């Protein structure tokens, strides 16, 4: 657990700039969570602006939750520059499988850019992996097959780290497979926890190997959720407590509470 806890320190020490082109539903939460985790956010999406911003960024997070053509144009410009600069690109394919527009957009980024991380729920990742999956809007769906095998296969195909979020988060880089069992059900009662996780994956990938970074990110947020749930009376009080718990998370707490399994 020590190597994962050290990634928390690296993020806080280096304060990486994480450029996020994300959805307007959770943009403020993603920015604040990035700060709470120890990184710095920039949320610019204009094609005229993103290229210069990427030159000083340490990671790029693309979230397709509220897509339109102008945003896609900005994402492409940012991803092209990120490719030139060699910084990690995280794709959160929100709602892939729910509509053709979302699915095709996600597949375009997967095929045209060297992604470091693809992070989504079971339905989204299953759709992109070409297995039978059900997706309801942007909510998690179901897949036919073993999530570990699906994550491993997709990661190997695209040479990246794949994260399937769920009761047990599954992470694979095509070689290793890990599971994270931290978290509480109330995390699913507020919008944006998945988007925030992608932002934090970006922060961790900026300072470490993407596989270890994603394991750290998912475990850290899960531990913080468990801590926040101890005092929360419901979703309304859980959310600020969650941000506080992320901010105050220590290495010792992480090492003690992380439930990480290495399957391969």
Swiss-Prot record:
Q: Give the record's pathway.
A: Cofactor biosynthesis; thiamine diphosphate biosynthesis; 4-methyl-5-(2-phosphoethyl)-thiazole from 5-(2-hydroxyethyl)-4-methylthiazole: step 1/1
Q: Which EC numbers characterise this protein's activity in its record?
A: 2.7.1.50
Question: What keywords were assigned to this record?
Answer: ATP-binding, Kinase, Magnesium, Metal-binding, Nucleotide-binding, Thiamine biosynthesis, Transferase
Catalytic reaction annotation: 5-(2-hydroxyethyl)-4-methylthiazole + ATP = 4-methyl-5-(2-phosphooxyethyl)-thiazole + ADP + H(+)
Query: Which coenzymes or cofactors are required?
Result: Mg(2+)
Domain of life, per UniProt, equals: Archaea
Annotated binding of substrate, by residue: 43, 192
Residue intervals passing through the bilayer: none
Gene3D superfamilies on file: 3.40.1190.20
Q: What class of enzyme is it?
A: transferase
Q: Name one GO biological process term.
A: thiamine diphosphate biosynthetic process
Query: Is Transferase one of the keywords?
Result: yes
Kindly list the GO molecular function terms attached to this UniProt entry.
ATP binding; hydroxyethylthiazole kinase activity; magnesium ion binding
Residue sites binding ATP per the record? 119, 165
NCBIfam families hit by this protein: PRK09355.1 (NF006830), thiM (TIGR00694)
- Record-stated family: Belongs to the Thz kinase family.
Q: What does this protein do?
A: Catalyzes the phosphorylation of the hydroxyl group of 4-methyl-5-beta-hydroxyethylthiazole (THZ).
Q: Any idea what this protein is called?
A: Hydroxyethylthiazole kinase
């Amino acid at each position: 657990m020590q190597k994962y806890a050290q990634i928390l320190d690296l993020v806080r020490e280096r304060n990486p700039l994480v450029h996020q082109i994300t959805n307007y539903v959770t943009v403020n939460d993603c920015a604040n969570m990035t700060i709470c985790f120890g990184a710095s956010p920039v949320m610019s999406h204009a094609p005229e602006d993103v290229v210069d911003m990427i030159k000083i960024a340490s990671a790029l997070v693309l979230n397709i939750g509220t897509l339109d053509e102008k945003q896609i144009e900005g994402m492409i410009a940012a991803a092209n520059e990120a490719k030139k600069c060699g910084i990690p690109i995280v794709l959160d394919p929100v709602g892939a499988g729910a509509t053709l527009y979302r699915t095709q957009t996600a597949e375009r980024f997967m095929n045209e850019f060297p992604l470091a991380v693809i992070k989504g729920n079971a339905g989204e990742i299953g759709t992109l992996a070409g297995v039978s999956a059900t997706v309801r809007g942007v909510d998690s769906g179901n897949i036919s097959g073993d999530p570990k095998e699906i994550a491993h296969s997709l990661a190997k195909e695209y040479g990246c780290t794949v994260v399937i979020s769920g009761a047990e988060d599954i992470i694979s880089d095509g070689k290793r497979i890990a599971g994270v069992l931290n978290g509480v059900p109330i995390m699913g009662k507020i919008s944006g926890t998945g988007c925030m996780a992608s932002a934090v994956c970006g922060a961790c990938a900026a300072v470490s190997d993407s596989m270890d970074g994603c394991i750290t990110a998912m475990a850290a947020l899960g531990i913080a959720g468990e801590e926040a749930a101890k005092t929360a009376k419901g979703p309304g009080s859980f959310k600020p407590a969650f941000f506080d718990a992320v901010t105050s998370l220590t290495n010792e707490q992480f090492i003690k509470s992380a439930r990480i399994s290495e399957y391969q």
